[in-house]
């Protein structure tokens, strides 16, 4: 057994408690508390003072993936991320480290003539280079081709998709709406030209038939990576408040023991109640 001393140890309980000592045995934390109390309780334990001047925080906390939104991505999109995804018992998806890697995966997917639309997640301009509607039109011009940025804050799409989902109606002077030299849409929409309009993609992106599949992939990936906690910015931003509540009711279990925290998106809830502040507060 070892007892580690920290200047301040932050806990993840409801009171946001702090401590100064961590008791560890066989690779597992068995108790956290006052360092002096712990060394008296476990007098035979080895004292580790290497971190006595350091602040210690919980590890393996995933702060920003939006589990429900990511589950939609994983369930409905083909990955083109520059990161390697390990889904444990469901297999792995190798990284698309280069532009060629990404284009090869795009070409393979759009060759599937049975699909009505082609969604991809993980586009990264730094790794994959600039891509526009023109290049995507060359791959497929009679069905939607949509590349979601890995950040979740942007999209590239072919001309067919722009027209089908209404992105060709976004004011051209909107921040994040990229144009060609001739002043036409080039297929890239980011931030202000994308975030308020993500619901336009609902018919294909928020396909609930594949939500459970995406959820299982998300949980298995979290398990492989040792994730112990995550948070969600609640408020119906993806498919409505009630759907979010249903999704998270049985989110974790004994196979996937992930601690969930929920932060309410006040504006989304307020919109649900026609901007009635009292009803929003009561909800």
Model-derived regions, located:
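Divalent metal-binding segments
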Residues: 2-5, 10, 14-17, 21-25, ...
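Non-catalytic terminal/interface segments that mediate subunit docking, oligomerization
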Residues: 281-283
